[in-house]
């Protein structure tokens, strides 16, 4: 049993010699190296498998504490440093560089996209700056372009090529200049329209205010005219009332004028009526009768009926008002309306006037 165990132990201890056997085939490595370098069909993703010792953990000397002693090859060189130092081969270096280049591209596509955008933006910005410098036109070029824009807002391609060749410009420069000029023209027209609209609106407001002022002035003039007419009317009524009062006082004092009245039988009732109303009317009538009798011819049979034409006087409105004031005692109390006469006084006036006219015609 012990012998068998020792044999097994010896077999186990002899396992590292297998690795030494594997590393003792340099022609295989040389052929693989030469083929990988010469063969251009190998992709970058192909990875050379690690050594056989790393794939099998039982063969790995680091996993066994018993294999602490260094292993020596027949040539006297240690195989482990050779296996753990792959950068010695140039094709390994190429593979690592390719892996480093591919891993960031595969792991961060977003970062690569951003970097590409940045790289694209940078030349664009630099190109934009250079383009802005190229937009400096000479006075002659601007003059010719303005003339052409005055006649044609849009250019056809043949004309654009012709102008570009004439002014020593590129076709793109001419096209961009016309685009910018059209936008400028549009802004100018819009500003003018806005200003005109504001001016029209202000003019409308001013016209509306003037119309309102005219209407107000006309209304005020009408009010002033009406008030003036009312004031004149009130003044006229006040003067007429004062005159009527003064004349009424004169009648009461006996200073009244004589009026030609014919003493006809048809007017006797009216005379009696007035005699009963006021005593002053009797004096007036007696004086009028005396004047009429003095002016008549005594020999004529119509001496008591026909008055003389010299003493004939037409009744005026003031005399009528005087008589009405003397006849009716109610009129002095109501002096606001001087034309407010009684029915009896109107009958008296109409009868006297008609009789006088008839007598004049008969005479």
Swiss-Prot record:
It is found in: Nucleus. CDD domains: homeodomain. Gene3D superfamilies: Homeodomain-like. One of its GO terms (cellular component) is nucleus. Keywords: Developmental protein, DNA-binding, Homeobox, Nucleus, Transcription, Transcription regulation. Residues 31-46, 55-78 have a biased composition (Polar residues). Residues 130-189 bind DNA. One of its GO terms (molecular function) is DNA-binding transcription factor activity, RNA polymerase II-specific. Its main location: nucleus. A motif (Antp-type hexapeptide) lies at residues 88-93. Transmembrane segments: none annotated. The keyword Cytoplasm does not apply. Residues 23-133, 183-216 are annotated as: Disordered. PANTHER family: HOMEOBOX PROTEIN HOX-A2, PROTEIN ZERKNUELLT 1-RELATED. Belongs to the Antp homeobox family. Proboscipedia subfamily. Sequence-specific transcription factor which is part of a developmental regulatory system that provides cells with specific positional identities on the anterior-posterior axis. This is Homeobox protein Hox-A2. The lineage of its organism: Eukaryota, Metazoa, Chordata, Craniata, Vertebrata.
